[in-house]
A protein has these predicted regions:
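Solvent-exposed soluble domains appended to multi-pass membrane proteins
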Residues: 1-187
Length: 187
């Protein structure tokens, strides 16, 4: 399913769901994913690099979708969360990126119910998106933490900020007898 078709379906679904009151709608775009991304009939041929054309197309598509949302009656009472799942894995695309440049994902909260002065340079993981998303929707989170995540609109350190990436990577690689037996069913 090409992302432009996904956005068309999403518009139809959101229009229908908006008649039913408060809803959660989630979608995941895939045109920028490996192995080479997916060009659609709307992608420009502006750049020499295929991936650059796909990224430009994706950027225009997401912008167009958000602009459409802004024209809807439900927009003012809606929180939009845009979250990247990971930096590009297309190594050939990042070969010229300086090694000291920290590549991150794009994350954006539109119509957030909370604000902060600390909007850049936080170290965080996807685990922090759980409490942060609820906070931007207006939920009060006692202690600003849920599971292993920290509300990024709080001044509390995330587990990455507190312990460092290497330590967290080591910890999540460890096995758990409980998880192996009861969740993964390895035993």
């Amino acid at each position: 399913l090409k992302d432009y078709k996904l956005c068309e379906l999403a518009k139809n679904e959101l229009t229908e769901l908006s008649q039913k009151g408060k809803v959660n709608f989630t979608m995941a775009t895939i045109d920028c994913h490996m192995p080479q991304g997916f060009l659609c009939k709307y992608c420009p041929n502006t750049y020499d690099n295929r991936y650059e054309n796909i990224y430009a197309c994706q950027s225009q598509l997401v912008n167009s979708f958000v602009e459409w949302c802004k024209t809807q009656s439900w927009y003012q009472n809606t929180t939009i969360v845009l979250v990247g799942d990971h930096p590009t894995m297309a190594q050939q695309y990042v070969n010229d990126v300086p090694s000291d440049y920290q590549r991150t994902t794009y994350n954006c909260f539109i119509n957030s119910k909370v604000t902060t002065d600390q909007i850049k340079n936080r170290q965080f993981t996807h685990m922090d998106m759980y409490p942060t998303t609820l906070a931007v929707m207006g939920f009060n989170i006692e202690g600003n933490k849920l599971a292993l995540g920290t509300n990024l609109f709080s001044e509390l350190p995330t587990i990455i900020e507190k312990y460092g990436q290497d330590y967290i990577n080591e910890e999540v690689q460890k096995s758990s007898e409980y998880l192996d037996k009861n969740i993964y069913q390895f035993n």
